[in-house]
Amino acid sequence: MASPSSHSPRQRLRQLLPDLKLGNWPTGPLNGITDVPGVLTHTTTLQPASNRSINTGLTVILPHAGWFDNAVHAGLFRLNGAGEMTGSHWIEETGLLSSPVVLTNTYAVGDAYRGVYDHAVKHNSDGGTVDWFMLPVVAETYDGHLNDLTVFSVKPEMVGAGIDGATADLTPEGCTGGGTGMVCQGFKGGTGTSSRMVKGLGPADGDGNAQPRDYTVGVLVQANYGQIRDFRVAGVPVGRIIMEQREKEGDEATLAHQAEVQEAKEKKDGSIIVILATDAPLHPTQLKRIAKRATMGLARVGGYGHNTSGDLFLAFSTGNKIPVQELSDSTDPFKAKALTMEFTEDKTINGLFEAAADATEEAIYNAICMAETTVGHQGHRVDAIDLTQLKDIMEKYM
């Protein structure tokens, strides 16, 4: 259902404001997480025309196509723990990610978890025998304001279809995938993505010479947190300006919707999941540090990590692949075996830190700008941000 705030075609923030400067680093070709070589995504969106109370879905992120046999290094950061990310204990224990990352709604975690296992068993069992180890990674945010959680719309088979259908195309944004029913900073939110490219060097040769390399940092968010009063774009207090304009106009219907969304968020602030990917060769401790930098991007937009907000950040690197399913009778678990890998020097990591913060910030903007006004469960309505109004406000400060 459309409203004045979504009559104009939806645009990503850079399309709307091409002269806006966001950080020091250029974007990748798609300005999305799939700019990181090998990373694949898929979104399943559930908004049946016959039942507007269903507004949900799931997003699948594959670190690389061979995720089952070869893990990648990963690190986690929890800004506020009112949420769930399965498999996180094992990532903390080993620094390894060997699962798809699935983002969905709070009540669909079990079905998504089952879906990852169903797919793994289908493709990796021999005569009913399972002789491998893998813990699915599923994260959630709460979409109960716009989605009827009691009907459990997400099914396990949707996860398998998402894994098989994942591509390197730009991830659809806004009301898509796991972000379909989400609300962010008082506006319709959802799925958003962005990327940055950072200059770097490969390992030195025998003569001490290192060849230039470009590294990519890509971010995907499922954004479902915050209040309109705190919403900022590149430092501009857009949310407060919009609130003041609405009060001056005296549109009772709009003010009523605004108050309804604000009240719902005050009762249950709904969380943000941030997935950060890079091809820079980083070890788990460095990746935990990268994940922490998502906090800076979130704070710039207006996130505070409120009590009931599950703000969970996962970073992984495709720079090294670690075999995890190659156990054989000749493997001696008591005989330590060395692997040869590359890692980035800590003293050269600042550009990657900046890229992580900047891409997180822009991914949230894209989630908000690409989302459309939605009328959902019990007639609840959440308006998309008015892009014309946003542009007019920002151009006064640029």
How should each PLM-predicted stretch be described?
Residues 2-398:
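Alpha/propeptide regions of enzymes that mature by internal proteolysis
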